[in-house]
Amino acid sequence: MALVADFVLQRLREWGIERVYGYPGDGINGLLGAFDRAEGHPEFIQTRHEEMAAFMACAHAKFTGEVGCCTATSGPGAVHLLNGLYDAKLDHQPVVAVVGQQKRLSLGSHYQQEIALEQLFSDVSEYCQMITHPGQARHVIDRAFKTALTTRSVATIIVPDDIQEEDAQPSPPKMHGSVFSSVGWSRPRMLPDEGELRKAADILNAGEKVAMLIGQGAAKAASEVVEAAELLGAGVAKALLGREVLPDDIPFVTGPIGLLGTKASDKMIQNCDTLFMIGTSFPYAEWLPDEGQAKGVEIDIDGRMIGIRYPMDAHLVGDSRETLKALLPLLRRKEDRGWREEIEKDVREWNDLCEKRAGQHFEGKINPEAVASELSPRLPDNCVLTADSGSGTNWWARHLKLRKGMQASLSGTLATMGPGTPYAIAARFAYPDRPVIAFVGDGAFQMNGMNEMITIKRYMDRLAGPAPFIFCVFNNQDLNQVTWEQRAMAGDPKFPGSQYIPDVPYAQYAELLGLKGIYCDQPKKVGKAWDEALASDRPVVLEFKVDQEIAPIPPHIMLAQGKKAAKAAVHDPEKAGIAAKGMRQKLSEVAEHLPGRHHDGE
């Protein structure tokens, strides 16, 4: 007779789960035995750490649209999952975690590795339940999946060690208290009220300078977004999680918005008279219009979040695609295209400026912007791009120009360090024939990326070419994003005790594991290094020794931030090098092209 552990995996299969990311431990011994008997249906993918398993489950959901799944043992293994699960929760991704627990008999005795898991997972999970009876497994699993899909969030199933080894009850006895659930779920067709649609159309039709801001919630509405932009003569800015919704070769797509955004996006938002947000919860008020400057229309599937980021005049709660399809017939084409032409001109000027900056190298060191700039025209069709959190994310956001069919993601809301590498691994497992390229800082690579190269070594037969699989490591021996934040936001000089990190031969480490390692420290060889990496049939660690003193300058510079940065520079340990390179000239060169917003209050 099958055990509860076998039934759990069978039910996961019925819900479409093909692989479960995790790390073994005695709290899930029953499940591990069931994985062995399941013979790869679903398969167990062993990561180096449970946090990486949760990141991979989140990435699977992001890149496939399916539920991601991870597992961990009781106690410490369960605790390790949390950061990756919060990444899924905050970026609205459906993930189911299956977690072990000590035997029911021992619970409440302060037993070894006993943790109150239902309390531990209560905040990160929309649904968290412990299975205490074999007949309960069916409906707990089913409800976990239905909840994860409906809420686009995390559900956690806790399975005590002894329950895993009991005989399964696929169909519990028909008696009072028994529950008989089913596998299945369908996405609802959500549309706003017709009156609100007409109100939204009136606002958009009246606007003379319409700016559109889209996020990942617009992912299935690309053609409708383009049609709306064409009718309204609008430009389209993208929140980072919405990078893949529209390709960057559309002339009126202004690129990312915010601290890592473009001048074109910032200028459009600053000067618009109507803001149209679609499928995004972009939170930063300093990058949105001033209150009262613009009329607002928003589409969001979650009514709890609509009108929260900017005061809206029309609130369209519904699916982005269906709502836009209902709205489009109500929109009138704007004959005056002056606003659109201005936006397209700003996009061209920003792209020219980025190209110019990427070509500036100092003292023979590689400008990190050039790493992204050289890759952009070389990007393979249909590739998947991931980024970690750090200064390299700036160059990933600004210099990589996505084309149709490409996918890209990062930890958008949690903005945690560490997901760039596991995201890429999950993407490769999901799409073994697609090129996958990760941008990772040396800090994040030391934090966990190096360990996950061992995961790649273990599954080399699955993850190797012919499609490129590349981990681009920015080696600047500095936790660079935080260093610049210390300077600009706190007015403090760089503190080497917290910011310096050891120099590690990342490319050589890759070779030690049987991967391909490529090292580049010369500006004129950046393009050649990319060509070599893209031609490899082995996973590649491509290490660039880059200049740590290239500032990730935002699209507009707050006066207060400029003052603090100047104050920090006086006592900065790198002040000699910064001065020698003419950092002031580099900053002023960019600043003269940027919009003002130089208010003391900012």
Regions found by a protein language model. Name each.
Residues 5-8, 13-18, 26, 31-36, ...:
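Active-site diphosphate/adenylate-binding microenvironment
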Residues 160-162, 390, 547:
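Active-site beta-loop-alpha junctions enriched in small/polar residues
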Residues 33, 58, 119, 226, ...:
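Active-site phosphate/pyrophosphate- and oxyanion-stabilizing loops and adjacent acidic/basic residues
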Residues 154-156, 215, 334-350, 364, ...:
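Flexible, glycine/charged-enriched surface loops at secondary-structure junctions
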Residues 23-26, 44-55, 70-76, 132-134, ...:
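Active-site nucleophile and cofactor-binding loops and adjacent substrate-binding regions
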Residues 158-159, 386-388, 543:
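Short beta-strand segments
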Residues 98, 106-113, 307-309, 315-317, ...:
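Thiamine diphosphate
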Residues 1-338, 378-381, 435, 460-471, ...:
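N-terminal alpha/beta PP-like core and its mobile active-site loop of ThDP/TPP-dependent enzymes
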